[in-house]
């Protein structure tokens, strides 16, 4: 916006100067100068008007850090690690005018813990239309890459899709869901785009964002959470350093992670492995209340309790964590 404003000012100044020196130049020269300045002003005005009615990729659009922080803190429950890491990673990346590589996040945890929800929050804070934006691209492994015998075809298609869309918008976001169901080797096709290259075939990928969502590593995360609970320590005491190293190694060695022996891990191209902790009873109740508010319903604590108690919890003896997180809250609330 600052650049556009400066250009408009420059164009206006050019018109003013052209008018004041009209007597000192030939009529044709003056006409050309005024015409050029008018063309610049007209283009900028057209571009501004166009972007009011159609989605434009505005690279200079700043990230509203306060709005992002509020969304994460008020809408994501029981995930203090994810909230902190994602906020710092995104704000740091977007505040860097010259990043050396794309931002790559790998989100891990059992179903219903908030991974997809966070990717939606991130998309909406980066592009106003969120997941509906032309600059946000969602890949679902079982839908887009179902056949193991077509790995080479998928790799070629993936490279072309990413190259074309980053060429159109440097700030593109790519989300890969169900990474644990992705055939090994497919994701390595994007390795050149995640590396520290200034350009690849004339295209810079340094301002793009890649997000991987996976259930892989959920068992490792749960074990750590349980160890803390059994030791009488709060879940909020769990730090990223308690999980990230174990998570990266575990995913690398897991044949069903989508990142098995992947060059993305081997070459340290994934910036953060972000654990999503299993949700407790109190977090499920938070999800029920949030869903009620989203539906415009008054909060009925009796219903909140009944829905939460209908969920199943594990381990068998302690019954601490919801085995489906908050995934079935919406459908269960329909019965009340």
From Swiss-Prot:
Keyword field: ATP-binding, Chaperone, Endoplasmic reticulum, Glycoprotein, Hydrolase, Membrane, Nucleotide-binding, Nucleus, Signal
InterPro entries membership: P-loop_NTPase, TOR1A_C, Torsin, Torsin_1/2
Pfam families the UniProt entry points to: TOR1A_C, Torsin
Enzyme Commission number, as recorded: 3.6.4.-
Chief place where the protein resides: endoplasmic reticulum
Result after altering residue 335 to A: No effect on interaction with TOR1AIP2
Binding locations of ATP: 109-116
Enzyme class: hydrolase
GO molecular function: ATP binding; ATP hydrolysis activity; identical protein binding; kinesin binding
Record annotation: effect of changing residue 178 to Q: Loss of ATPase activity. Produces sinusoidal endoplasmic reticulum structures where it accumulates. Highly enhances interaction with TOR1AIP2. Localizes in the nuclear envelope
Keyword Glycoprotein part of the UniProt annotation: yes
Record localization: Endoplasmic reticulum lumen; Nucleus membrane
PTMs per UniProt: N-glycosylated.
UniProt xrefs under Gene3D superfamilies: P-loop containing nucleotide triphosphate hydrolases
Known role: May serve as a molecular chaperone assisting in the proper folding of secreted and/or membrane proteins. Plays a role in non-neural cells nuclear envelope and endoplasmic reticulum integrity. May have a redundant function with TOR1A in non-neural tissues.
Subunit structure: Homohexamer. Interacts with TOR1A; the interaction may be specific of neural tissues. Interacts with TOR1AIP1; TOR1AIP1 is required for TOR1B location on the nuclear membrane. Interacts (ATP-bound) with TOR1AIP2; important for endoplasmic reticulum integrity.
Name of the featured protein: Torsin-1B
Source organism of this protein record: Homo sapiens
Lineage: Eukaryota, Metazoa, Chordata, Craniata, Vertebrata
Gene that produces this protein: TOR1B
């Amino acid at each position: 916006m600052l650049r556009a404003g400066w250009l408009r000012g420059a164009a206006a100044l050019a018109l003013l100067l052209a008018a004041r020196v009209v007597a000192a130049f030939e009529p044709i020269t003056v006409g050309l100068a005024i015409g050029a300045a008018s063309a610049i002003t007209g283009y900028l005005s057209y571009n501004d008007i166009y972007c009011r009615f159609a989605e434009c990729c505005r690279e200079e659009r700043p990230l509203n850090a306060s709005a992002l922080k509020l969304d994460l803190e008020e809408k994501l429950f029981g995930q203090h690690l994810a909230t902190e890491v994602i906020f710092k990673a995104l704000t740091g990346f977007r505040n860097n005018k010259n990043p050396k590589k794309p931002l790559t996040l790998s989100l891990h945890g059992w179903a219903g813990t908030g991974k997809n929800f966070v990717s939606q929050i991130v998309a909406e804070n980066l592009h106003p239309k969120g997941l509906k934006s032309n600059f946000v691209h969602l890949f679902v492994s079982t839908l887009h890459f179902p056949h193991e015998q077509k790995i080479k075809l998928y790799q070629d298609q993936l490279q072309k899709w990413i190259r074309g869309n980053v060429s159109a918008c440097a700030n593109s976001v790519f989300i890969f869901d169900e990474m644990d169901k992705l055939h090994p080797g497919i994701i390595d096709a994007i390795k050149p785009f995640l590396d520290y290259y200034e350009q690849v075939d004339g295209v810079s990928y340094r301002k793009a964002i890649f997000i991987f969502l996976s259930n892989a590593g959920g068992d490792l995360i749960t074990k750590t959470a349980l160890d803390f609970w059994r030791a009488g320590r709060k879940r909020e005491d769990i730090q990223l350093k308690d999980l990230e190293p174990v998570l990266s190694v575990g995913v690398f060695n897991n044949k069903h992670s989508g990142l098995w022996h992947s060059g993305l891990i081997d070459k340290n191209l994934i910036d953060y492995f972000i654990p999503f902790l299993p949700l407790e009873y109190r977090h499920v109740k938070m999800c029920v209340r949030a869903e009620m508010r989203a539906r415009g319903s008054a909060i009925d604590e009796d219903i909140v309790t009944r829905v939460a108690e209908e969920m199943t919890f594990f381990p068998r003896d302690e019954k601490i964590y919801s085995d489906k997180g908050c995934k079935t809250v919406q459908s269960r609330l329909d019965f009340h």
